Amino acid sequence: MIIGTRGSQLALAQTENVARLLKERGVETSIKIIKTSGDRFTDRPLHAVSGGVGAFVRELDDVMLAGEIDIAVHSMKDMPTIRPEGLPTVAVLKRDTPFDILLTYDGTTLDELPEQAIIGTSSLRRTAQIRRYRPDLITQELRGNIDTRLRKLKEGQYDGILLAKAGLERMGWEIDGEILSPDFFCPSPNQGTVAVVTRADPEIEAAVSGLDHTESRIVTEIERILISELGGGCTTPIGSYAELTSDKQEIHIRAEVLSLDGKEDVRIDEFIPMLGGLEKARELGHRLVEMGGKRLAEEALLQISRNACGTENSFDY
């Protein structure tokens, strides 16, 4: 079976892990690297690449539908909530750490950073959350693979950088930093989760389905349902995080939508029963819309569109 993947270090690490897991189950694979729009245009903010939605996914979907690959491995947070027919998400791997991490050259924490310190991030969500938590800090765009981002931090281009902790874990790197609490920095929906998508083929689906981790699938589906009516995908300032309680009877849900400048937000923080959790998540998603979440998401998309056209430059992404 042919596994398609992006060519970045992180994407290859994720794909090689899936290939290893399949080999343990007697499935032989080969890897085919596909260049995506998100990889080609690293000189511009991610939200400016094809609207940001599906920038790392769309080309892999296309080559799979064309029959050139059998399997695709994705960081699940990059996958739009609306997916093409005929490309089932057959496996959701066990989730890695879902939270953001702040790395600084000397170990300074977020609360200890001086005023006007420069924070690098490629995420509008993290930018908005930083602006809400520490409006005295400066946020600047940071693209590139993990190596590039760490090099820029070491060179002093930034006082700190924000990353997904899971990316460091998948690379096998142990780097000290400050794990940011989801109470203040609610992560992107499905952050820390790898999804395995296949062609709609019973033989391929059967080979891959054994990799599925039930608990991770449940919470990631909850997170996607929560934000499904908001629009904007992984590029807008939207956070959604669900975790099972220790007794597996309830799901703790956090979700939020922010304005780009971090001055306005709507938030949900509730426990819902495991039984009937999907329907309850839909109800909470509707409530998030009614509270003004959809308005904030639409305003963010409009502002992003204006910036991409060069009509406004009020946000230093």
From Swiss-Prot:
<keyword id="KW-0627">Porphyrin biosynthesis</keyword>
<keyword id="KW-0808">Transferase</keyword>
<dbReference type="InterPro" id="IPR022417">
    <property type="entry name" value="Porphobilin_deaminase_N"/>
</dbReference>
<dbReference type="GO" id="GO:0005737">
    <property type="term" value="C:cytoplasm"/>
</dbReference>
<dbReference type="InterPro" id="IPR022419">
    <property type="entry name" value="Porphobilin_deaminase_cofac_BS"/>
</dbReference>
<protein>
    <recommendedName>
        <fullName>Probable porphobilinogen deaminase</fullName>
        <ecNumber>2.5.1.61</ecNumber>
    </recommendedName>
</protein>
<feature type="modified residue" description="S-(dipyrrolylmethanemethyl)cysteine">
    <location>
        <position position="234"/>
    </location>
</feature>
<comment type="pathway">
    <text>Porphyrin-containing compound metabolism; protoporphyrin-IX biosynthesis; coproporphyrinogen-III from 5-aminolevulinate: step 2/4.</text>
</comment>
<dbReference type="InterPro" id="IPR036803">
    <property type="entry name" value="Porphobilinogen_deaminase_C_sf"/>
</dbReference>
<dbReference type="GO" id="GO:0006782">
    <property type="term" value="P:protoporphyrinogen IX biosynthetic process"/>
</dbReference>
<dbReference type="GO" id="GO:0006783">
    <property type="term" value="P:heme biosynthetic process"/>
</dbReference>
<dbReference type="Pfam" id="PF01379">
    <property type="entry name" value="Porphobil_deam"/>
</dbReference>
<dbReference type="InterPro" id="IPR022418">
    <property type="entry name" value="Porphobilinogen_deaminase_C"/>
</dbReference>
<dbReference type="InterPro" id="IPR000860">
    <property type="entry name" value="HemC"/>
</dbReference>
<dbReference type="GO" id="GO:0004418">
    <property type="term" value="F:hydroxymethylbilane synthase activity"/>
</dbReference>
<comment type="function">
    <text>Tetrapolymerization of the monopyrrole PBG into the hydroxymethylbilane pre-uroporphyrinogen in several discrete steps.</text>
</comment>
<comment type="similarity">
    <text>Belongs to the HMBS family.</text>
</comment>
<dbReference type="Pfam" id="PF03900">
    <property type="entry name" value="Porphobil_deamC"/>
</dbReference>
